[in-house]
């Protein structure tokens, strides 16, 4: 797997989280499998490659890849505006987080507790989702930049949905951190658009 593919998998994770946030905000629905994959990505330690962070299967990131392709193609018909806004906001928040060692320490200290909960209850249990959402609230929500989520207030006001959205934003920012650690940079989205698209088209065509 090339470094560019690894970067695109991580960036696909950012966009996957963004798509799921948008879906929950607008419809109150997202599959447990998709949510579980993103929550699981928070807890993976020492993966053999980037894909293993997301369950070892590109299919888990298909919706994220599609949203990323839509953003890079700049086609108004395929552009998913809210997921793109969330994804770019997560990339920005990750850069702020990187300057805050205290918040990184808090996240590092509390993830093992969430891991224990997940082992006991299961990844998508409401306790695990609530703990992950609370970790986002106690750390990333304290930064100057905030992510404003737009959607149907009937769904946004439900505590479980709010926790899911925060937990997914935390997972998306973890993916953004991974992307940057792999050498990803926002300028690539502007100046290497065609190269990224060609690689993404190949990844979408491949069986895995």
Swiss-Prot record:
It comes from the Bacteria. It is found in: Cytoplasm; Cell inner membrane. It is a peripheral membrane protein. Transmembrane segments: none annotated. This is High frequency lysogenization protein HflD homolog. Pfam families: DUF489 (PF04356). GO terms for cellular component: cytoplasm; plasma membrane. NCBIfam families: PRK00218.1-2, PRK00218.1-3. Coiled coil: none annotated. The keyword Electron transport does not apply. It comes from Pseudomonas putida (strain ATCC 47054 / DSM 6125 / CFBP 8728 / NCIMB 11950 / KT2440). Keywords: Cell inner membrane, Cell membrane, Cytoplasm, Membrane. Belongs to the HflD family.
């Amino acid at each position: 797997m090339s470094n560019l593919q690894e970067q695109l998998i991580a960036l696909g994770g950012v966009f996957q989280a963004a798509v799921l946030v948008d879906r929950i905000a607008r419809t109150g629905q997202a599959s447990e499998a998709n949510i579980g994959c993103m929550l699981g990505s928070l807890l993976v330690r020492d993966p053999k490659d980037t894909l293993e962070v997301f369950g070892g299967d590109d299919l888990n990131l298909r919706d994220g890849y599609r949203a990323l392709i839509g953003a890079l193609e700049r086609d108004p018909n395929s552009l998913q505006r809210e997921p793109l806004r969330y994804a770019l906001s997560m990339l920005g928040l990750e850069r702020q987080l990187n300057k805050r060692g205290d918040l990184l320490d808090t996240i590092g200290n509390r993830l093992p507790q969430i891991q224990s909960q997940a082992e006991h209850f299961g990844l998508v249990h409401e306790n695990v989702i609530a703990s992950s959402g609370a970790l986002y609230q106690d750390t990333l929500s304290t930064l100057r930049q905030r992510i404003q989520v737009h959607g149907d207030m009937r769904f946004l006001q439900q505590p479980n949905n709010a926790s899911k959205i925060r937990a997914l934003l935390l997972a998306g920012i973890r993916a953004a951190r991974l992307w940057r650690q792999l050498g990803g940079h926002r300028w690539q989205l502007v100046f290497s658009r065609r190269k990224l698209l060609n690689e993404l088209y190949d990844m979408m065509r491949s069986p895995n």
